[in-house]
Amino acid sequence: MAPVPELTSEMMAYYSDENDLFFEADGPEKMKGSLQNLSHSFLGDEGIQLQISHQPDNKSLRHAVSVIVAMEKLKKISFACSQPLQDEDLKSLFCCIFEEEPIICDTWDDGFVCDAAIQSQDYTFRDISQKSLVLSGSYELRALHLNGQNMNQQVVFRMSFVHGEENSKKIPVVLCIKKNNLYLSCVMKDGKPTLQLEMLDPKVYPKKKMEKRFVFNKTEIKGNVEFESSQFPNWYISTSQAEEMPVFLGNTKGGQDITDFIMESAS
């Protein structure tokens, strides 16, 4: 067995004579105060039986103190015990031993956030004038009326729920054209917020914390939905009253521009 090193002056600053009672050659033989004669005892008249093994082990002082603190707290708890304790009974004691503390995180680490499962659903959208959204060319959405013969032209969006400024009315989401993996995003062009489509790597996206330009705050209004840009508040995904016009980002509600959409499941 390797010799025990001498205590340095720095280590002595954390040394207490009481530590000698915990670590002896053949295990603890005596303890001061309320821990005396606990080799075989009960916590109260009817409680948890405590047995201390005198077999030497390699548990650290931290382990010993953790056990002692827990036992001291349990000794102060009074509860009825008309039958032997079961696992469920012991679980209820954890809240008496441990104190729950909130974890405050001011910033997100994408390395951890991306491990969380992304909830996604497939939908089609029509504006309240019954115009469907179709892909025109490679990177442009247009709104037009479709009939039974060409209904298959409407795009299917995968809507994913992500982190954002969520409240009781607004839900942060991203919208991706499922077939082409094109994401709706909001950028500033020529001094004006603009809606565009961006192709992203499906191995990376969607992720729980998306770049803000991709995030829309979804709000339900009388059975319909609207999508407000997170990057540009008070700017919404909009369509024109005219036929086959591009879908755009607008800041007018209740006027000529249409911001309310009918959402139908495509899953």
Curated annotation (Swiss-Prot):
GO molecular function, one term: integrin binding
Keyword list, A-Z: Cytokine, Cytoplasm, Inflammatory response, Lysosome, Mitogen, Pyrogen, Secreted
Bilayer-spanning residue ranges: none
PROSITE patterns tied to this protein: INTERLEUKIN_1
Site (Important for interaction with integrin): 170, 178, 189, 203
Main location: cytoplasm
Prosegment residue ranges: 1-115
Domain of life of the source: Eukaryota
Keyword Transmembrane: no
One Pfam family of this chain: IL1
Compartment(s): Cytoplasm, Cytosol; Secreted; Lysosome; Secreted, Extracellular exosome
GO BP, sorted A to Z: cellular response to lipopolysaccharide; cytokine-mediated signaling pathway; fever generation; immune response; inflammatory response; positive regulation of canonical NF-kappaB signal transduction; positive regulation of cell division; positive regulation of immature T cell proliferation in thymus
CDD domains: beta-trefoil_IL1B
Gene Ontology, cellular component aspect: cytosol; extracellular space; lysosome
Further details from the record: IL1B production occurs in 2 steps, each being controlled by different stimuli. First, inflammatory signals, such as LPS, stimulate the synthesis and promote the accumulation of cytosolic stores of pro-IL1B (priming). Then additional signals are required for inflammasome assembly, leading to CASP1 activation, pro-IL1B processing and eventually secretion of the active cytokine. IL1B processing and secretion are temporarily associated.
Subunit annotation: Monomer. In its precursor form, weakly interacts with full-length MEFV; the mature cytokine does not interact at all. Interacts with integrins ITGAV:ITGBV and ITGA5:ITGB1; integrin-binding is required for IL1B signaling. Interacts with cargo receptor TMED10; the interaction is direct and is required for the secretion of IL1B mature form. Interacts with HSP90AB1; the interaction facilitates cargo translocation into the ERGIC. Interacts with HSP90B1; the interaction facilitates cargo translocation into the ERGIC.
Family: Belongs to the IL-1 family.
Function statement: Potent pro-inflammatory cytokine. Initially discovered as the major endogenous pyrogen, induces prostaglandin synthesis, neutrophil influx and activation, T-cell activation and cytokine production, B-cell activation and antibody production, and fibroblast proliferation and collagen production. Promotes Th17 differentiation of T-cells. Synergizes with IL12/interleukin-12 to induce IFNG synthesis from T-helper 1 (Th1) cells. Plays a role in angiogenesis by inducing VEGF production synergistically with TNF and IL6.
Name of the protein: Interleukin-1 beta
